[in-house]
Amino acid sequence: MAVQKENDRELIVDEDTLSEVINESKSGSPAAGHAVSDYFGTDEIFSRVIASADEEFGKSKRLLYFSGVAAGLSIGLSFLARAAVAAEVMPDGSPLIANLIYPIGFMLIVLGRYQLFTENTLTPVTLVLTRIASVPMLLSNWGVVLAGNLTGALIIGLVMATSGVLEPEAAEVAASFGEHGLSLPWFSLFIKAIVAGWIVASMVWLVHAAQDTISRIVIVFSLMFLIPTADLFHCIIGSCEAFYAVFR
């Protein structure tokens, strides 16, 4: 509560009301930068990330694992869709057209709240940094989610390689994705994966800063499009591509 004096009288003003008044000028635009209400502050975003991490740690290992499997299957859709579109537009079309469909699996994961290992490099770590959770708990969480993601990637890679779901041209393109990753030196692949992981972690932070679904979709699309365009490798999609190349 804030106390103001007017004509020798004390007026008690509710802080929420005061903030609302400050936040609007006569033109309807914010009167001060720090009073813009449709932006979360850094502390608020961090608190939202912690809340999400706390929810993850509260889940059973079984639920966490199957959520990870769902994420692995969903992210395989990025691999499948990119290969199918690339086969249609190449060699005459630009690979950027196929890269536009790459974020689709990440959209499913973000909107469906599935557990993806690279997302978990940010959210659960916040609980360790704030000493709410221990390092062994973090490693256990990572292990369960990674196992689930790899299971999903293995399933989708095996199904795509053995079921004939892809046309011959698309199957060749899909195989080239996996072979390209397997042909790179391990250190180069490692660095590319780290950069891709950093992009995903940035996406997670910005998704928690967004206030509506449309904003989240735009964030996911804008950042995930960078991964194939910059020839980076996401560890789970890369695993799916490698499984496909091996089983084919």
Predicted regions and their residues:
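Alpha-helical transmembrane segments and their helix-helix packing motifs
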Residues: 2-248
